[in-house]
């Protein structure tokens, strides 16, 4: 059994000599949340009616040390609580440092940047320490943050690309980290409660994705084979697929450029959805545990007087843990853990944004692939932000047996033209030009009684149809 050290607390750079109670809830994919209760007489002058000395703690750093495992957060609320005629307590609540990424809902975009580039840019601006090493290494043609906080956008990226996401107490981890040290826990010693469970989470899925540049529709499906599961998880995976035999038909959430990317997406999607097929929950007094900790769980079987045989039931990674510490030296935690060999974690439970049609200005129509695409800049896109090369909707477009290309209406907007942009699947990452718009400086209408219909080129050549 590990030697247990006292939990220490610091708020706004001030060490707290004691506390009434401390609760810290940590979970993958989310901010961590804490509540601290302090005796009012240890902080405030006798008889205060409102917080005085502690009021300046709002927005300040909170550091908890569990004897080697450190948690860094920020206080977001301080209050004076009274009940039952007592003099009261000071309550401090707040979140992990990832809360600094909770900007207001905003829009931004990136062209030809990697997931690593995007996440590092956001965390650096917010002053959040991060360990960024996603499995998805390639540069993304276009990625859009749409009316989301910075943290919600990072959650959505983790969902779209099935990347690991959690806060380890000091760093935001994006991408599967290197395996750390393992902590041994034994039921009857460090563990007072242990539940070993399995559940039916696996489902078959299939779908398609269209790539317009080469006019290819790619089809793919989940491999329906468990990855990284222990024997209990493997059995649950197989039982689940036996229950749910009809594949769900879905579209790929990220933009796909080839068949290999689509197959990899459905594989990782199924791995993420079924990651918790086998799990354990427990109660422990081991204080060094946190989200991301690897534990080697043992049980002790009584085989005779004073004789116990210890057996390992496997190694697990903690995905959720709640710490509760009180006066004196009391401490307990409650955790959930998944097999440590799983390749992906359950993805964040966040909705995909729904993009609405919006106005933009054409910044280029010199399509390098000569496909009639344009680049546009929407009103919220500032600085170097703009779309990648996007298609233009036209009344008629295609080919024929005698016309291999450009059959139909070919009217590509000019640079500087105002256009309306829509989105396939309402996905902000899939914009296209819906049509062009006249404005107060570019349009004069159809003349008296709207009699004139005309077609005018950039050089001034005009075809007019005048109603008589």
State where each predicted segment sits.
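Amphipathic alpha-helical and helix-coil boundary elements used as assembly
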Residues: 1-466
